[in-house]
């Protein structure tokens, strides 16, 4: 048995994401952690596969992403990359792995050797030097602003960011700083719709929203969440795409279509 993908569709690359943004084509991203789902998500037309530290929640059972290790991310990145998907493969740098530019580079190299084509790290202005250091060394970077789960204890919980005038101004400064440093993509999580729209219109790089409204260049959800596999209360920004669908692939195709056609997220999924 092989999960190697044979697709006539061109591969999604970092320049392709930029071209999609400029053409007004929405980008559909989902988290992915193994070969089986990598093949399925790729067939369904997902543009970006994110090996997220959310695996600490949905696979390992932790209440936060903080216990996830670099080895964990590298292992799951290799599982996804072996499929050779058309989708771009992005891997999270876990908590505590990018305290200095040199440390971030060494750990990014490990993830890229495992098959990542881009790394994601959480933070704004304070990370500009690190982002620049990585980009200068041919490591494509996705930044993550707003509700950054690795900062859950600093935030005092999972809270919407950028609601105050000062908070929104800082988010705009962060966005400008990471773009100026060379980031090629940015995730905006749990950010008020109007603020996310302002960031999206200000930047030249694509923005990927999760609980950040419809104006972003694309959307991302945790795979398990969009399939309705979550314990307890469903997060506001999540829609269960499995409802009414005959298969997981049909559910993923429905998600991709909803993102591309701008029918997701709705106001009920935004702040």
From Swiss-Prot:
Pfam families, alphabetized: Pantoate_transf (PF02548)
Residues that hold Mg(2+) according to the record: 53, 92, 122
InterPro entries the UniProt entry points to: Pantoate_hydroxy_MeTrfase (IPR003700), Pyrv/PenolPyrv_kinase-like_dom (IPR015813), Pyrv_kinase-like_dom_sf (IPR040442)
Catalytic activity: 3-methyl-2-oxobutanoate + (6R)-5,10-methylene-5,6,7,8-tetrahydrofolate + H2O = 2-dehydropantoate + (6S)-5,6,7,8-tetrahydrofolate
A molecular-function term among this protein's GO annotations: 3-methyl-2-oxobutanoate hydroxymethyltransferase activity
Residues at the active site: 189 (proton acceptor)
One cellular-component annotation, GO: cytoplasm
GO biological process assignments: pantothenate biosynthetic process
Entry keyword annotation includes Transferase: yes
Residues that, per the record, bind 3-methyl-2-oxobutanoate: 53-54, 92, 120
Keyword set, alphabetical order: Cytoplasm, Magnesium, Metal-binding, Pantothenate biosynthesis, Transferase
UniProt subcellular location: Cytoplasm
Primary location recorded for the protein, binned into one broad class: cytoplasm
Pathway: Cofactor biosynthesis; (R)-pantothenate biosynthesis; (R)-pantoate from 3-methyl-2-oxobutanoate: step 1/2
PANTHER family linked: 3-METHYL-2-OXOBUTANOATE HYDROXYMETHYLTRANSFERASE (PTHR20881:SF0)
Summary of the function given for this chain in its UniProt record: Catalyzes the reversible reaction in which hydroxymethyl group from 5,10-methylenetetrahydrofolate is transferred onto alpha-ketoisovalerate to form ketopantoate.
Protein family membership: Belongs to the PanB family.
HAMAP family, A to Z: PanB
Protein name: 3-methyl-2-oxobutanoate hydroxymethyltransferase
The organism of origin for this protein: Burkholderia vietnamiensis (strain G4 / LMG 22486)
């Amino acid at each position: 048995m092989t999960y190697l993908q044979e697709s006539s569709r061109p591969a999604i690359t970092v320049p392709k994401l930029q071209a999609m943004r400029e053409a007004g084509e929405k980008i559909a991203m989902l988290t992915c952690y193994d070969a089986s789902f990598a093949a399925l998500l790729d067939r369904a037309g997902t543009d970006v596969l994110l090996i997220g530290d959310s695996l600490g929640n949905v696979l390992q059972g932790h209440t936060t992403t903080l216990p996830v290790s670099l080895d964990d991310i590298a292992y799951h990145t290799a599982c996804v990359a072996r499929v050779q998907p058309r989708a771009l493969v992005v891997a999270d740098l876990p908590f505590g792995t990018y305290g200095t530019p040199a440390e971030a580079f060494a750990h990014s190299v490990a993830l890229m050797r495992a098959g990542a084509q881009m790394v994601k790290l959480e933070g704004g202005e304070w990370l500009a030097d690190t982002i620049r250091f990585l980009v200068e060394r041919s490591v494509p970077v996705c930044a993550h602003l707003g509700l950054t789960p690795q900062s859950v204890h600093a935030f005092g919980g999972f809270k919407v960011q950028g609601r105050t005038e000062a908070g929104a101004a800082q988010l705009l400064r962060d966005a400008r700083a990471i773009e100026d440093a060379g980031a090629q993509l940015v995730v905006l999580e749990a950010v008020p719709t109007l603020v996310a729209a302002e960031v999206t219109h200000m930047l030249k790089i694509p923005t990927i929203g999760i609980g950040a409204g419809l104006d972003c260049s694309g959307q991302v959800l945790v795979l398990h969440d969009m399939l309705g596999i979550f314990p307890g209360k469903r997060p506001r920004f999540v829609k269960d795409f499995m409802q009414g669908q005959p298969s997981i692939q049909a559910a993923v195709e429905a998600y991709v279509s909803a993102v591309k056609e701008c029918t997701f997220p709705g106001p009920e999924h935004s702040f």
